[in-house]
Design a protein with these regions (language model features):
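A cross-kingdom signal targeting lumenal/periplasmic-facing segments of multi-pass membrane
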Residues: 111-257
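Terminal, regulation- and interaction-focused segments at domain boundaries
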Residues: 69-99
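Envelope-exposed proteins and targeting segments
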Residues: 83-85, 103, 161
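Signal peptide processing junction and immediate N-terminal pro/mature segment
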Residues: 18-35
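Compositionally biased P/S/T/G-rich terminal and signal peptide-adjacent segments
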Residues: 43-78
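Bacterial N-terminal signal peptides
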Residues: 7-20
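Positively charged n-region of N-terminal signal peptides that target proteins for export
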Residues: 1-4
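Primarily extracytoplasmic ectodomains and periplasmic/lumenal surface modules that are beta-strand-rich
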Residues: 92-109, 114
């Protein structure tokens, strides 16, 4: 069975192309100059969002002040709108890493090459491989700073919970770091609009948002929560690969212990 899983993983990685997920936490919020310097290679929608966010870079803001500058959706490298930004996480990089590790989430491999090597090592050690990479999506003009996955190893190719996280350019009113996140659950594999194999997501993305919260609460890592509804909430949309999804439009704010 493990040999079959490994072969399937190789096939999946081959058709999926480059699937990178940077795992390093940035040391500081990007400055307006840094954000603008990325504009030549930034997807169009992300570029517009980065400009509005850059104007507030480094400032302490209430969430009411943040929402107008917070992009509602992430984009693909080509600029196609994708997943909804449905989470804001308040805490240091150490708190984020500790909280999600305690809650059972793992960081996926960063590159296809890493995945192949890791899969071989796990197979030789008679262990299941669960760290398959996730694709790059963009927010604030850059790909995700890191990501987390949660899924049974035997099902992880087709089914898993996962989310991407970006450090925002601003701080909350108390001076704490704020992270924006987009979480969805993969429930199968399908061909996208270009004919490439990709994951199919659960259309009710609120389920994943609330599942992420539940895992953190079960681990005792949540200090407080609140839900925010933007003036222009995302109720229904289509991912960059053509999947439809729906939401109540609320963004969950999680304050970590």
């Amino acid at each position: 069975m493990k040999r079959v899983m490994l072969i399937f993983a190789f096939a999946w990685l081959a058709v999926a192309g480059s699937m990178a997920c940077p795992a390093a936490f940035p040391q500081s919020a990007p400055s307006a100059t840094q954000t603008q310097s990325q504009s030549t290679s930034t997807p169009p929608q992300a570029k517009n969002s980065a400009i509005s966010a850059a104007a507030l870079a480094g400032k302490r803001l209430s969430f009411e002040q943040m929402l107008p500058a917070l992009p509602r959706r992430v984009v693909s490298k080509s600029g196609a709108p994708g997943d909804m930004v449905n989470l804001l996480i308040v805490g240091s990089k150490e708190q984020v890493a500790d909280a999600f590790q305690a809650a059972g989430w793992i960081q996926p491999d960063k590159t296809t090459q890493d995945a192949i090597v890791h899969a071989i090592q796990e197979t030789m050690a008679h262990k299941a491989y669960a760290e398959m990479p996730i694709s790059q999506l963009y927010l604030f003009g850059r790909p995700q700073d890191f990501g987390f996955v949660d899924g049974m190893p035997i099902q992880v190719v087709a089914e898993r919970n996962h989310f991407r996280v970006w450090r925002t350019p601003w701080l909350d009113s108390q001076g704490h770091t704020v992270w924006a996140s987009a979480g969805t659950r993969d429930v199968g594999i399908e061909k996208d609009q270009s004919g490439t194999l990709t994951h199919r997501i659960d259309p009710n993305i609120d389920t994943e948002r609330d599942y992420i919260l539940q895992t953190l609460e079960d681990a005792g890592k949540v200090a407080n929560t609140e839900y925010l509804t933007p003036a222009d909430p995302v109720r229904q949309a289509v991912t960059a690969t053509g999947d439809t999804y729906h939401s109540d439009g609320r963004i969950l704010v999680i304050y970590l212990k």
